[in-house]
């Protein structure tokens, strides 16, 4: 069973068990799970997740679970999003590249935490949804691209951090080349037997990286094709 079908099955099984109704409920849960960065918690408080989920799952917007979106993709579990962002140790002066915009929830969080966000989405439907969502929130520091994230931004920009929202067997070389020395990249790595683990890389120079393996996750695959 693929990830999307698993999510739908779990939602049907647990639809009566709703614990979080508002942003502050979700933020309280994130605190209990160890997310203590006040800037990240403030971003979660400000961004309405309900804007980014499908209408039929609106009542689950603030649950700490991933949810299906269009194009057989997902909006990630809030705790995993918060943890990944926390690992990057972002500053307000930073520029971040995001691979996999989806409907733009994580992008919006990043926009509150750094100077510029560059985000690439392969599906035109999601690309357009995200742009609309960000316009509604009046976020001015997000740069959108419709394309294959494996190819990077295709411009002479080096990033302080890169976050990949889909699983891959290895980090694409063009993304590694786009990272500044001292920068961090976080992504879910695919292993055998459908195992995935979150990986954090810190770039020392073009030939040296510090690698940290974190915990098991489940993400949709990183696609290598033309945008659709």
Q: Across the structure, where does each feature detected by a protein language model lie?
A:
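Class I SAM-dependent transferase core
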Residues: 2-97, 105-109, 113, 126-140, ...
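Short, solvent-exposed coil/turn segments at beta-strand boundaries
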Residues: 206, 225-226
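Conserved nucleotide-cofactor-binding alpha/beta core module
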Residues: 89-209
